[in-house]
Amino acid sequence: MKFEAIAVEKIPLIHEGDNLPSIICEKIGLQDRDIMIIASTIVAKAEGEIFRLEDITPGEEALEIAARTGKDPRFIQAVLSKSREVFVETPFMLVTTLAGHTCVNAGIDESNIENGFLLYPPENPDASALKIGKELEKLSGKKLSIIITDTNGRAFKIGQTGVAIGIYNIKPVKRWIGEKDLFGKVLEITEQAIADELAGAANLLMGEGAGGIPVVIIRGLDYYCEGDTSIKESYRPENMDVIKQGLRCLRNKK
């Protein structure tokens, strides 16, 4: 068994209004059940999620956090505008975004963007993946899966890895519960983070900085799944998320 990870090279700089599916199809031929891994940065650029700090007016909460942390209140306001809950204020802001993804600084990106500008993540990554996927399928005539990715740090390790923040035609988690292991024991809790693993694999080719590749095809693995899918299926239910519960306890003690 094997699979390929194929970098889609020579993707041009993306601007607001660009047709990503058309651009991708011009650069590479697609096959049935290809899994398209697309960096959130180019999706956000095409959707016009670019802003400047000088256009941000901080509110009362942003000013209060700035007074406590010494951060730029305009940047804090930008983070708050995309967040439903703040867990940590410094040395970085750890938040859950409006889309439900928990990450640093609401996923706002200061890299791979023109000087003086910053980039919000896609407002609804699942909806973005669906739109891109349907158009790619229409243009190519192939059945495709889409994963929109971002890079995240890990709580207990150094370094970032690719993670899925939006999906189309793929389940984010494979549940092995009820299957048997090598010794015939029934698995009770094993759940494999398929979408995140694929995002991490693609990130080896995507890289970071000036040499980044924003689109990678995973070919040879069949995780195609028609019907409604959402990255939210991979988020822990609130009553099971002990890390968030612990962060809330620490926050409320201050």
Swiss-Prot record:
Record EC number: 6.3.2.31, 6.3.2.34
Record: residues binding a divalent metal cation 2: T151, E208
Keywords: GTP-binding, Ligase, Magnesium, Manganese, Metal-binding, Nucleotide-binding, Potassium
Subunit structure: Homodimer.
Annotated protein name in UniProt: Coenzyme F420:L-glutamate ligase
SUPFAM superfamilies, per database record: CofE-like
Record GO biological process: F420-0 metabolic process
Species: Methanosarcina mazei (strain ATCC BAA-159 / DSM 3647 / Goe1 / Go1 / JCM 11833 / OCM 88) (Methanosarcina frisia)
Coiled-coil stretches noted in the UniProt entry, renumbered to this chain: none
InterPro entries recorded: F420-0_g-glutamyl_ligase, F420-0_gamma-glut_ligase-dom, F420_ligase_CofE_arc
Signal peptide: none
EC class of the enzyme, as a word: ligase
NCBIfam families: F420_cofE (TIGR01916), PRK13293.1 (NF009809)
Residues that bind GTP: 11-14, 40-41, 45, 112, 206-213
Keyword Nuclease: no
Pfam family, one: F420_ligase
PANTHER family: COENZYME F420:L-GLUTAMATE LIGASE, PTHR47917
Pathway: Cofactor biosynthesis; coenzyme F420 biosynthesis
CC cofactor: Mg(2+); Mn(2+); K(+)
Biological classification of the source: Archaea, Methanobacteriati, Methanobacteriota, Stenosarchaea group, Methanomicrobia
Chain sites annotated for binding a divalent metal cation 1: D109, D150
Matches recorded under Gene3D superfamilies: CofE-like, CofE-like domain
Substrates-to-products reaction catalysed: oxidized coenzyme F420-0 + GTP + L-glutamate = oxidized coenzyme F420-1 + GDP + phosphate + H(+); oxidized coenzyme F420-1 + GTP + L-glutamate = oxidized coenzyme F420-2 + GDP + phosphate + H(+)
Cofactor: binding comment: Binds 2 divalent metal cations per subunit. The ions could be magnesium and/or manganese.
Molecular function GO labels: coenzyme F420-0:L-glutamate ligase activity; coenzyme F420-1:gamma-L-glutamate ligase activity; GTP binding; metal ion binding
Ribonucleoprotein recorded as keyword: no
Function according to Swiss-Prot or TrEMBL: Catalyzes the GTP-dependent successive addition of two or more gamma-linked L-glutamates to the L-lactyl phosphodiester of 7,8-didemethyl-8-hydroxy-5-deazariboflavin (F420-0) to form coenzyme F420-0-glutamyl-glutamate (F420-2) or polyglutamated F420 derivatives.
